[in-house]
């Protein structure tokens, strides 16, 4: 009997595709969010010729849940499908409840789902001075 070759599992990918690719190119005919963005970016749209730039802004005060996973797929997936970018921005506005271990866990979970923010990792607190200025 021939030994079956073991497949290397890539976290977050099923049959070589991310959840977003499956949603947008699988059995789903259309997705209203993607359709609306395409209208805005398309000829005559208010954002014609521009790139999609989304963000996923979790608060690092606990572990992610299934609702976060859905938001990750929508935020990172929409950017991926449309050739845009997605930032990971920690909403660190409540330092009493936040912890670095949650930041690490969030990053690991996003990678497990098959996405990466590259060099676009931010904290909301990075922009506090600007927020105070504009307030």
Language model features with spans:
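N-terminal Rossmann-like or analogous alpha/beta NTP/dinucleotide-binding catalytic cores
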Residues: 2-135
